[in-house]
């Protein structure tokens, strides 16, 4: 029996081979197909960028964005691979562009009106298919944009001049509220309060606690910035999300109380024309069934946080630049005296404040706050000879482009860079085209009003050795000073006194 078992003639060799060969063939074919797929993926891409390398490339590039921040990672990759290059974010092919011709193409075409970001992250903060800033549903975005456009132009823009000037005067009269024990002014907090107050009066009209809401806005922004590109697995770990959940809830709860008060005032108003504003228009649209309550609340929230979040930092950087460049301050003061004199600033002064406007433009070019734009291709396209597939993410690196093309002294702060008219394709601090910043005109007017009103009353100085170039910053969704660092305060000296303001 044993010999029979050991005898090869008792085995059906043909049967054994026929069973083994198909299994081996399938394994070899699968491996070959996978290798061909990887090889084909890398070889068919003509766009410069890091290697795919069996999926490790996308993992590394996404981790770099999470570690360095969006803005810093974009600068790193453009410097390494050129002004039109490809990485992966959230596993999706993403182009990083700092070339003006390519940016112009993306901004002007309607098939790039969508943005991109983690769906779970945007749901977490309430922006997924709601509001305007990161609403990636083109139909819903188009439904709310007219409300923003109407509120931020025409009569609203004219009203803003007086409202903003009054708010600045009111806050400067109470400057001790934002001074430390040495009399140094916390400019960021001051600007955030002024802009929140102005936005509230214009768009909501409900009394609020500025100090508390400003803190909540910063917490919300930190959550938004931190969660925008997080992988889905992050949101399945509850303890990782807890801090951000509280920050988002704090602002949303505070805003909901204010908006409910607005609803009550509308329902009990004897004359509706007395309370018609941005929030009222949205609430009426909700009653007509055009918008959901959640979308209305998110739109109002975004309208109130926009200026305290970004424009306040822009003016903060501007004041530091004024302190470092006294000749620029002198030129601005001469123009302010000539155009405005001793009276209140008016809307018809805006076009005459050319030096102030050039200063604002050069400040936004040299030290931007919003230095990138995130978009998604909604259809196949070709940009500067490179094929772009539908669904491709695109990041426009505006800050880098503003230092690469056209300007005679791109790495210096000088008004010479705007001595001549700059073609708008080379300077886009607010973007342009169908998804340009809805508030770009009112933002420019608001910054002029703030600078004129403040500089007429105070000369500004930084603490010794402080300037924007040496300031620690975080370059993520936007570029902000590191507020954990010291000596971000400034010294305000009244124009009619040689002594520093004592708060």
UniProtKB/Swiss-Prot annotation:
One of its GO terms (molecular function) is heme binding. The keyword ATP-binding does not apply. Gene3D superfamilies: Cytochrome P450 (1.10.630.10). It comes from the Eukaryota. Pathway: Steroid hormone biosynthesis. It catalyses: testosterone + 3 reduced [NADPH--hemoprotein reductase] + 3 O2 = 17beta-estradiol + formate + 3 oxidized [NADPH--hemoprotein reductase] + 4 H2O + 4 H(+); androst-4-ene-3,17-dione + 3 reduced [NADPH--hemoprotein reductase] + 3 O2 = estrone + formate + 3 oxidized [NADPH--hemoprotein reductase] + 4 H2O + 4 H(+); androst-4-ene-3,17-dione + reduced [NADPH--hemoprotein reductase] + O2 = 19-hydroxyandrost-4-ene-3,17-dione + oxidized [NADPH--hemoprotein reductase] + H2O + H(+); 19-hydroxyandrost-4-ene-3,17-dione + reduced [NADPH--hemoprotein reductase] + O2 = 19-oxo-androst-4-ene-3,17-dione + oxidized [NADPH--hemoprotein reductase] + 2 H2O + H(+). It is found in: Endoplasmic reticulum membrane; Microsome membrane. Substrate binds at residues 309, 374. One of its GO terms (cellular component) is endoplasmic reticulum membrane. It is an enzyme of class 1 (oxidoreductase). Heme binds at residue 437. GO terms for biological process: female gonad development; lipid metabolic process; response to estradiol. Its EC number is 1.14.14.14. It is a multi-pass membrane protein. Keywords: Endoplasmic reticulum, Heme, Iron, Lipid metabolism, Membrane, Metal-binding, Microsome, Monooxygenase, Oxidoreductase, Transmembrane, Transmembrane helix. Its cofactor is heme. The keyword Transcription does not apply. PANTHER family: AROMATASE, CYTOCHROME P450 FAMILY 4. A cytochrome P450 monooxygenase that catalyzes the conversion of C19 androgens, androst-4-ene-3,17-dione (androstenedione) and testosterone to the C18 estrogens, estrone and estradiol, respectively. Catalyzes three successive oxidations of C19 androgens: two conventional oxidations at C19 yielding 19-hydroxy and 19-oxo/19-aldehyde derivatives, followed by a third oxidative aromatization step that involves C1-beta hydrogen abstraction combined with cleavage of the C10-C19 bond to yield a phenolic A ring and formic acid. Belongs to the cytochrome P450 family. This is Aromatase. It comes from Capra hircus (Goat).
């Amino acid at each position: 029996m044993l010999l029979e078992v050991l005898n090869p003639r008792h085995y059906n060799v043909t049967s054994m081979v026929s069973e083994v060969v198909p299994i081996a063939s399938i394994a070899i074919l699968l491996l070959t197909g996978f290798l061909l797929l990887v090889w084909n993926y890398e070889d068919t891409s003509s766009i410069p960028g890091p290697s795919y390398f069996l999926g490790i490339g996308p993992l590394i590039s996404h981790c770099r964005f999470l570690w360095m921040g969006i803005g810093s990672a974009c600068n790193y990759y453009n410097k390494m691979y050129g002004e039109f290059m490809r990485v992966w974010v959230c596993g999706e092919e993403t182009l990083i562009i700092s070339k003006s011709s390519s940016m112009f193409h993306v901004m002007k075409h309607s098939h790039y009106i969508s943005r991109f970001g983690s769906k779970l992250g945007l749901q977490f903060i309430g922006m997924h298919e709601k509001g305007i800033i990161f609403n990636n549903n083109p139909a819903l975005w188009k439904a709310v944009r007219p409300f923003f456009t109407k509120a931020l132009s025409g009569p609203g823009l004219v009203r803003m001049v007086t409202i903003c000037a009054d708010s600045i005067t009111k806050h400067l009269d109470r400057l001790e509220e934002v001074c430390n024990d040495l009399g140094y002014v916390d400019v960021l907090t001051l600007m955030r309060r002024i802009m929140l107050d102005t936005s509230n009066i214009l768009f909501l009209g409900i009394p609020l606690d500025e100090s508390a809401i400003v803190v909540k806005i910063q917490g919300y922004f930190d959550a938004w910035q931190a969660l925008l590109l997080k992988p889905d697995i992050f949101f399945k770990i509850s303890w990782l999300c807890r801090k951000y959940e509280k920050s988002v809830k704090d602002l949303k709860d505070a805003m909901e109380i204010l908006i409910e008060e607005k609803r009550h005032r509308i329902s009990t108003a004897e004359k509706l024309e007395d309370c018609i504003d941005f929030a009222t228009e949205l609430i009426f649209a909700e009653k007509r069934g055009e918008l959901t309550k959640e979308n209305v609340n998110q739109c109002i929230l975004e309208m109130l946080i926009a200026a305290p979040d970004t424009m306040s930092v822009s003016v903060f950087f501007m004041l530091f630049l004024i302190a470092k460049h006294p000749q620029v301050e002198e030129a601005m003061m001469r123009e302010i005296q000539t155009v405005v004199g001793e009276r209140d600033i008016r809307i018809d002064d805006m076009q005459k404040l050319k030096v102030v406007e050039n200063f604002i433009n050069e400040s936004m070019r040299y030290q931007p706050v919003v230095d990138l734009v995130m978009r998604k291709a909604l259809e196949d396209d070709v940009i500067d000879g490179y094929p772009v597939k539908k669904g491709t993410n695109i990041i426009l690196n505006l800050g880098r482009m503003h230092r690469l093309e056209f300007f005679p002294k791109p790495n210096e702060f000088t008004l010479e860079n705007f001595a001549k008219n700059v073609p708008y394709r080379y300077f886009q601090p607010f973007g342009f085209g169908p998804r340009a910043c809805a508030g770009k005109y009112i933002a420019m007017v608001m910054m002029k009003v703030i600078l004129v009103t403040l500089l007429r009353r105070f000369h500004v100085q930084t603490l010794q050795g402080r300037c924007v170039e040496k300031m620690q910053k975080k370059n993520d969704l936007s570029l902000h000073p590191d507020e954990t660092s010291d000596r971000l305060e400034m010294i305000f000296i009244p124009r009619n006194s040689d002594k520093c303001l004592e708060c």
